[in-house]
Curated annotation (Swiss-Prot):
Function: Chaperone involved in the maturation of iron-sulfur cluster-containing proteins. Has a low intrinsic ATPase activity which is markedly stimulated by HscB. Involved in the maturation of IscU.
Name recorded for this polypeptide: Chaperone protein HscA
One GO term (biological process): iron-sulfur cluster assembly
Protein's UniProt keywords contain Transferase: no
Species per Swiss-Prot/TrEMBL record: Escherichia coli O17:K52:H18 (strain UMN026 / ExPEC)
Similarity comment: family membership: Belongs to the heat shock protein 70 family.
Length: 616
């Protein structure tokens, strides 16, 4: 029996009718498109039999070229040849200039601080450049399948944030594509291998592409793919190997650091060729800018060893997040062209204690998995037994009184997901509530990331705690968040979709998770202090209201005792002694017990006035 049947509304295929769908691996260095034909997933080649499409676009005044043709212009027209645009997706111009100071492009900032690249075709943003790559892939698929595509699944790094995911969807829309779903790249690889092997157990997906590194721990059980945890670094990949080797060649050749763009591109091309050759050979001869020399695999390994070590540290963190030991991992799936580097395979095998899987071409495995998923989502496989569960990278929650963060959805919760939690008002007569959406693992607002703010108005004017507001967090299959707040008695509501202009990198996410562990004890103490201060404020607010209304119920001496207790509480609440605040609250409660009882008696008498015992 099928565990889950998924199809887009109106796209469920009629009997004997297949809809055309494709999986697209929109990569940093290379991109691919794949489809399912005769029950087999396969990548689609161009007229020359090449499956990879370089993620490069060359712009001219009268048009543009994509792929191999564009790449040949890289050395001749560097400023108009855009490569690795995926690294720019969802980032601010300031962030790009800080992270990638040596890019050969000229940038301008848009009104909201986002990057615009100066080209012969005008100012272009990363979304437009990505759309041109997607158009080229779609054209290849349309020609190969002899028909228009009904839908596509596009893969993204597991740590892409909301802005980067939304940018990818916008690029697809600009390219005229109907996006069935965005799919995490490691998850796509798990689909490809899971269907082939039919095994059950824990799998690690080690994805080292041109521009990003992702590590995911998945559990396969009875056809269910569950992502236990993800991690990685969106600013680490094979491109970094290339640049390290290019810098090494430049030093050996005595080429000035500030040489022109053409020489820089020539150096990079020589480094890429050398890296590829060193996957099979022990040494390689390099000719560049009139210099000739030899580079050994051992020298190359020394250059990249620190970067490979960084990937393994991320693996260790993600295993801990998943609650899994390395020896529990049944298989290690290698994804991305950079996993062909012998040192990478060797170190990964040593770390997990088993040789990694490489039976599916690591360049193609993600596109193949995306094609399989697209075939299901478009309605061609109504009996599919595969259920896919992704996760969110950081906890989502709300700011509460005292600058605290109340987590609504913990990190590594599977998506799509919807969670609701009830909150209430703090003050008497409160008719509005500010909703502050937070992301992070720490206990205090100041240590987490603000995602969005909105207000819920029209709350009934009731005593503090009288109104009940249900806040619902919903994360869709693409990892995009919407938050809705509703007052339960009236049904009044407000909502917001969280689409930040640019977001966190995965290394920043990893740093936030690490900080939450490092400061765990300190954060708990800070939360306890903040909670006691909030409670002190609530007690004093309630007491002042009661005294204003019914002070006549107290003698002068009784009033003085209560005032003294309240003054002491107000004083200690300004400090950092949790126990002192707690004791002062208890003292106020003790000194006001008789006063509270008299107020209750008075309220009862007022309620019964004019009524007989029989009526009661």
């Amino acid at each position: 029996m099928a565990l889950l049947q998924i199809s887009e509304p109106g796209l469920s295929a009629a009997p004997h009718q297949r809809r055309l769908a494709a999986g697209i691996d929109l990569g940093t260095t290379n991109s691919l498109v794949a489809t399912v034909r005769s029950g087999q997933a396969e990548t689609l080649a161009d007229h020359e039999g090449r499956h990879l499409l370089p993620s490069v676009v060359h712009y001219q005044q009268q048009g543009h070229s994509v792929g191999y043709d564009a790449r040949t212009n890289a050395a001749l027209d560097t400023a108009n040849t855009i490569s690795s645009v995926k690294r720019l997706m969802g980032r601010s111009l300031a962030d790009i200039q800080q992270r990638y100071p040596h890019l050969p492009y000229q940038f301008q900032a848009s009104e909201n601080g986002l990057p615009m690249i100066e080209t012969a075709a005008g100012l272009l943003n990363p979304v437009r450049v990505s759309a041109d790559i997607l158009k080229a892939l779609a054209a290849r698929a349309t020609e190969a399948l002899a028909g228009e595509l009904d839908g596509v699944v596009i893969t993204v790094p597991a740590y892409f944030d909301d802005a980067q995911r939304q940018g990818t969807k916008d690029a697809a829309r600009l390219a005229g594509l109907h996006v069935l779903r965005l799919l995490n790249e490691p998850t796509a690889a798990a689909i490809a291998y899971g269907l082939d092997s039919g095994q059950e157990g824990v799998i690690a997906v080690y994805d080292l592409g041109g521009g990003t590194f992702d590590i995911s721990i998945l559990r396969l059980s009875r056809g269910v793919f569950e992502v236990l945890a993800t991690g990685g670094d969106s600013a680490l990949g094979g491109d970094d190997f290339d640049h390290l080797l290019a810098d090494y060649i430049r030093e050996q050749a005595g080429i000035p650091d500030r040489s022109d763009n053409r020489v820089q591109r020539e150096l990079l091309d020589a480094a890429i060729a050398a890296k590829i050759a060193l996957s099979d050979a022990d040494s390689v001869t390099v000719n560049v800018a009139g210099w000739q020399g030899e580079i050994s695999r051992e020298q190359f390994n020394e250059l990249i060893a620190p970067l490979v070590k960084r990937t393994l540290l991320a693996c260790r963190r993600v295993l801990k997040d998943a609650g899994v030991e390395a020896d529990e991992v049944m298989e290690v799936v290698m994804v991305g062209g950079s996993t062909r580097v012998p040192l990478v395979r060797e170190r990964v095998g040593e770390f997990f204690g088993r040789p990694p899987l490489t039976s599916i071409d690591p360049d193609k495995v993600v596109a193949i998995g995306a094609a399989i998923q697209a075939d299901i989502l478009v309605g061609n496989k109504p009996d599919s037994e595969m259920l896919l569960l992704d996760v969110i990278p950081l906890s989502l929650g709300l700011e509460t009184m005292g600058g605290l963060v109340e987590k609504v959805i913990p990190r590594n919760t599977t998506i799509p997901v919807a969670r609701a939690q009830d909150f209430t008002t703090f003050k008497d007569g409160q008719t509005a509530m500010s909703i502050h959406v937070m992301q992070g693992e720490r206990e205090l607002v100041q240590d987490c990331r603000s995602l969005a703010r909105f207000a819920l108005r029209g709350i009934p004017a009731l005593p503090a705690g009288g109104a009940h507001i249900r806040v619902t967090f919903q994360v869709d299959a693409d990892g995009l968040l919407s938050v809705t707040a509703m007052e339960k008695s009236t049904g009044v509501e407000a909502s917001i979709q969280v689409k930040p202009s640019y977001g966190l990198t995965d290394s920043e996410i990893a740093s936030m998770i690490k900080d939450s562990m490092s400061y765990a004890e300190q954060d708990v103490k800070a939360r306890m202090l903040a909670e006691q201060k909030v409670e002190a404020a609530r007690v004093l607010e309630s007491l002042h209201g009661a005294l204003a209304a019914d002070a006549a119920l107290l003698s002068t001496a009784e009033r003085q005792v209560i005032d003294d207790a309240a003054a002491h509480l107000s004083e200690v609440a300004q400090g950092d002694d949790v126990d002192a605040i707690e004791q002062a609250i208890k003292n106020v409660d003790k000194q006001t017990q008789d006063f509270a009882a008299r107020r209750m008696d008075q309220s009862v008498r007022r309620a019964l006035k004019g009524h007989s015992v029989d009526e009661v």
